[in-house]
Amino acid sequence: MRIPLLAPDNYAFPDPAYALAWCDGLVGVSGDLDAGRLLEAYQNGVFPWFLRDGWFFWYAVGPRAVIVPERLHVPCSLAKTLRNGSYRVAVNGCFAEVVAHCAAAARPNQDGTWIAPEFQTAYLKLHEMGYAHSFECHYPDENGKTRLAGGFYGVQIGRVFYGESMFALQPDASKIAFACAVPFLADLGVELIDCQQDTEHMRRFGSELLPFADFAERLRMLNAVPLKEEIGRREVACRGL
């Protein structure tokens, strides 16, 4: 299998359809993780998966797991927790901290993390540019002081939110953040959430599989349409529960 080497002065990607058919989804490798390359990747259904020997590996996954916000499913046990209301959810309150916690989180069947320092730096740059966002769930500790308990981060381009990674220091904290974030994003105009991988965790929230060609077409339509309002930095209320 020949792995395409991505040119440092050209952010274009090879056709993901070829990678899916012949290379197990591996689209190419690059020596950089520039913001421009990341944005080009997401808009074409490609994302960086890991760093090895100084090379960044870029993948496409198909069929693609996605969530359509209006079809979000909140499991009954989580809905009960949400109604309890002892938590607080915010967006973009502590982006770097969320990414660092995601990098440190233990993952089943994984040796270490793919979120190397180079990834953290790259996504912080996207955050500063207004593309990457974090959602945080806070809980009061034994002294009544509110502390970060879980959350997730991802990238928003147009009306698509590309989820990246989650963490939880307290049971259900990342799920609470996600359940509150989806209606919030929908209110701002987000029409599709990319889950990347087909996981049991996302299936509980109502994820569905799109053939990659259909997913790519949705991206072409939605990435060019701006949100009704910027995501910003604010409190996020859970509604409809």
From Swiss-Prot:
One GO CC term on file: cytoplasm
GO molecular function terms attached to this record: leucyl-tRNA--protein transferase activity
EC number: 2.3.2.6
InterPro entries documented for this protein: Acyl_CoA_acyltransferase (IPR016181), Leu/Phe-tRNA_Trfase (IPR004616), Leu/Phe-tRNA_Trfase_C (IPR042203), Leu/Phe-tRNA_Trfase_N (IPR042221)
EC top class, as a word: transferase
Entry-linked Pfam families: Leu_Phe_trans
Assigned keywords, A-Z: Acyltransferase, Cytoplasm, Transferase
Broad class of the protein's primary localization: cytoplasm
Localization: Cytoplasm
Reactions mediated catalytically: N-terminal L-lysyl-[protein] + L-leucyl-tRNA(Leu) = N-terminal L-leucyl-L-lysyl-[protein] + tRNA(Leu) + H(+); N-terminal L-arginyl-[protein] + L-leucyl-tRNA(Leu) = N-terminal L-leucyl-L-arginyl-[protein] + tRNA(Leu) + H(+); L-phenylalanyl-tRNA(Phe) + an N-terminal L-alpha-aminoacyl-[protein] = an N-terminal L-phenylalanyl-L-alpha-aminoacyl-[protein] + tRNA(Phe)
HAMAP family reported in the protein's UniProt record: Leu_Phe_trans
Function recorded in the entry: Functions in the N-end rule pathway of protein degradation where it conjugates Leu, Phe and, less efficiently, Met from aminoacyl-tRNAs to the N-termini of proteins containing an N-terminal arginine or lysine.
Assigned protein family: Belongs to the L/F-transferase family.
UniProt protein name: Leucyl/phenylalanyl-tRNA--protein transferase
UniProt source species: Neisseria meningitidis serogroup A / serotype 4A (strain DSM 15465 / Z2491)
Encoding gene (name): aat
